[in-house]
Amino acid sequence: MAPMKLYGSTLSWNVTRCVAVLEEAGAEYEIVPLDFSKGEHKAPDHLARNPFGQVPALQDGDLFLWESRAICKYVCRKNKPELLKDGDLKESAMVDVWLEVESNQYTPALNPILFQCLIRPMMFGAPPDEKVVEENLEKLKKVLEVYEARLTKCKYLAGDYISVADLSHVAGTVCLGATPHASVLDAYPHVKAWWTDLMARPSSQKVASLMKPPA
């Protein structure tokens, strides 16, 4: 069977969220770059893959998927179902909870920091809006307090097993490490240990190697 095709840019943490899971699941895939400066993400052929003209999009044979977390779940179901814990009702429910936490709590606090510190200088030649950064750092710290409490009870977010919920944090947190605020994790020893453990995995190292924002 032909490898899956992941369309997008490896500087997008939504794309590399999928890479973390594809790598961890041992899936066969290739990355098909899109040139945003040429509007390739809005071209008809890409709109056929993702009708919103965004990335990522995944092609597996005649199946086209979009939305990064949906892609991640599909890859797990196909290649490594244990990352979803679908065989256990309670464990799979906790995976779902923490994937939702990443989507609705962690990433909304993190994304404005990444935009201000990485995207704004790179794309617009403008300095970060420090007020926006500080406001969202405070939001992120509140989220990390919840993570710290959770990780005192188990090694990973859903339990004592790695899951798609952990892997979904990798790309964004790698980008956090490229900002002046990487040390925010240091105040939370269990979060820091969890992150160190994640970054020792080959899947996370692959993501880090692909995501190299300009200095």
From Swiss-Prot:
This enzyme's EC code(s): 2.5.1.18
Domain GST N-terminal: 2-83
GO molecular function term, any single one: glutathione transferase activity
UniProt tissue specificity: Constitutively expressed in roots. Expressed in anthers, callus, panicles, sheaths and stems (at protein level).
Gene Ontology biological process: glutathione metabolic process; response to toxic substance
Pfam families, alphabetized: GST_C, GST_N
Residue spans crossing the bilayer: none
EC category name: transferase
GO cellular component: a single term: cytoplasm
SUPFAM superfamilies the record matches: GST C-terminal domain-like (SSF47616), Thioredoxin-like (SSF52833)
Family statement drawn from the similarity comment of this UniProt entry: Belongs to the GST superfamily. Phi family.
Name assigned to this protein: Probable glutathione S-transferase GSTF2
